[in-house]
């Protein structure tokens, strides 16, 4: 077993300080641009596990390598202005922690008739999004935003490489994935027609609210980009689990060897075929789970296929 299996395990605790960040605390009557200074503090901890297995059975040689890492950080200090409510502070949260409203279902006729809906600062209609009033003042505003979901930077990452060689044939593949990560659907993918002259995405057609789909709808009723309540407000409605597993690369080939190759002045010749981004398993579906919010409204990740010939003289 010892000659086939190897690996390593690392556990780390890191306390970073003097991080360059912008000052935020100043009297309200001072109209100046706050300086960037070395005052930030962030604690990090986590582990990395690497395992490797190599084995040969006659002419058949194979290997499997895997790695798994987990890293979590916490903002210890970032010079925040005093907040009225504890859920508004970024201090104590992870770097890249999303903040937003908590989606509390879609407005119904019964909600409107009851008169008990918090003031969302617009004329709500059935099918509009409604949010939780965290501070109980009966008004939905910035004081009702709180940490939601996981950070935008994955806390869990993993990868697997595997392959074999057998009498000139070779095969290899690479899988990668991440977990405990969230992504906001970008604004251009929330608003019908992208807020302009773009297409209507299939998920919008399938999931939007109508009186007939009120019990199963996953997105608000169709309305324009001006409806900030439904589309612009970041909330748990638009925050998605961006965990994924992706087959990043597969390659298969055959290497020719033999005395006959000397006659054509070749040491060896290899033909191969490869593919990239062939499979992805994820919850996001409508965008690349690896893409940050601002990159989602771009050309999607492509499958790539290659056929090649290597000649060694």
PLM segments and residue spans:
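Extracellular/periplasmic, surface-exposed regions of secreted and cell-surface proteins
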Residues: 1-100, 230, 234-313
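A short local loop/turn or secondary-structure capping micro-motif enriched for an aromatic residue
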Residues: 16-17, 127, 150-152, 180-182, ...
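Active-site-adjacent bridging/hinge elements
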Residues: 21-25, 46, 132-140, 219-229
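Conserved small-residue
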Residues: 37, 54-152, 214
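Phosphate-sensing "switch" segment of ASCE/P-loop ATPases
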Residues: 93, 167, 193
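Short helix/loop capping segments that flank catalytic or ligand/cofactor-binding pockets
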Residues: 110, 115, 172-174, 181-183, ...
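Glycine-rich, aromatic-lined ligand/substrate-binding cores of catalytic
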Residues: 151-185
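Extracytoplasmic gating/loop element in the C-terminal half of outer-membrane beta-barrel translocons
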Residues: 178-270
